[in-house]
Amino acid sequence: MTSSLPNIGFISLGCPKNLVDSERILTELRSDGYNIIPSYENADLVIVNTCGFIDSAVQESLEAIGEALEENGKVIVTGCLGAKEDRIREVHPKVLEVTGPHSYEAVMQQVHKYVPKPAYNPYVNLVPKQGVKLTPKHYAYLKISEGCDHRCTFCIIPSMRGDLDSRSITQVLDEAKRLVEAGVKEILVVSQDTSAYALDRSKEEQNKTVFWNGMPIKNNLISLCEQLGKLGVWVRLHYVYPYPHVDQLIPLMAEGKILPYLDIPLQHASPKILKAMKRPGSIERTLERIKKWREICPDLTLRSTFIVGFPGESEEDFQLLLDFLKEALLDRVGCFKFSPVEGAIATEMPDQVPEEVKEARFHRFMQLQQEISAARLQQKVGKVFTVLVDEVDEEGIIARSIADAPEIDGVVYIDNPNRVAVKAGQFIEVKITRADAYDLYASLIN
């Protein structure tokens, strides 16, 4: 049935936001009747959706483009690195076309140009109403906005993806409903700046009452989360910038409407470094808020990311960061050594930190946080949790608790000696038997 259809090869690189863009393009391709294949060999055209956030990601994208050109020869480039067409063509002048991020229509026009759209076939053009998804069937990313209004000095995202542009709340909720109807058990809300949702709209628009499913709602983040919480699935928030109104989300978590999980990138704890980064600078206020959040929602899991070795970071600045970790006792933490990014203000700042110092600070940071994370997980031993199954194999079951986002957090390894019938996407009850620095181990509760 599909052998005569034109074949499109597809490579998706980068973060979950880019993954959502890839899903959108793949959905359009399938709707137009193209066959998606995982290899270069038999492809009539290859699309590479690139990442350009840091220099290592740029290099990975350029290598992927080069490999596609070498193996196939007909390549269209899109995504974040596509915003720097000159950079791409300097290395790979033979690419057919280049577009920037979220340029779905342009990508499809280019595909039609080089590989004409096949005749409509109702059996082939049929696409699930939730669209093509690259994640397992039981979870999906829901992108609520594009771009960012912040100008952090280490970041070039606004130059590639533009200023904040929020989707309408009814559009977001319609997509979420389709995902749930398709069997999704966990929705992961993503954007460049999730807590800024709808702040690009006027006050009048934000306060305007709209109707969804017959219910009056406001066009803001709190209303969005309240409605998502009524869909009967796990709802997890990522990339939450620490605006004051984030405090209003915590009661929703305490009430079980959305998962008690906040992915809130703090980046540093030194006021001097935060100012240089153009990030919120009151770390004392942040600690006060964390304490209050945990009082309201004791089960709250806090994830954050930090940068060590930022230009001008002294040993004193770094010690402030370590002191913050000891006091905040965050559950999940990612750490990155500052990486110069072409076009970022911080790349040109004076007092660049030597690589060996960055490396040493990174290891000191990770060693401390590993001890904190291990102690936090140890507190869960002996307790009973509901977990969502990701995989089942001969060795047992791999699942995640409400504290574990896919790909970036730990997992729960569950013994299943009696081969109890369990499948991916199922919620099960387990008792935690032990813990290490990142993962939990558990037994099934019949």
From Swiss-Prot:
Sites where the protein binds [4Fe-4S] cluster 2: 148, 152, 155
Coiled coil residues, start to end: none
UniProt domain TRAM: residue ranges: 378-446
Binding note for cofactor: Binds 2 [4Fe-4S] clusters. One cluster is coordinated with 3 cysteines and an exchangeable S-adenosyl-L-methionine.
SMART domains reported in the protein's UniProt record: Elp3
EC number: 2.8.4.4
Reaction catalysed by this enzyme: L-aspartate(89)-[ribosomal protein uS12]-hydrogen + (sulfur carrier)-SH + AH2 + 2 S-adenosyl-L-methionine = 3-methylsulfanyl-L-aspartate(89)-[ribosomal protein uS12]-hydrogen + (sulfur carrier)-H + 5'-deoxyadenosine + L-methionine + A + S-adenosyl-L-homocysteine + 2 H(+)
Gene Ontology biological process terms from the UniProt entry: tRNA modification
Annotated transmembrane regions: none
Cofactor section: [4Fe-4S] cluster
Function: Catalyzes the methylthiolation of an aspartic acid residue of ribosomal protein uS12.
Protein name: Ribosomal protein uS12 methylthiotransferase RimO
Species this chain originates from: Pasteurella multocida (strain Pm70)
Gene that specifies this protein: rimO
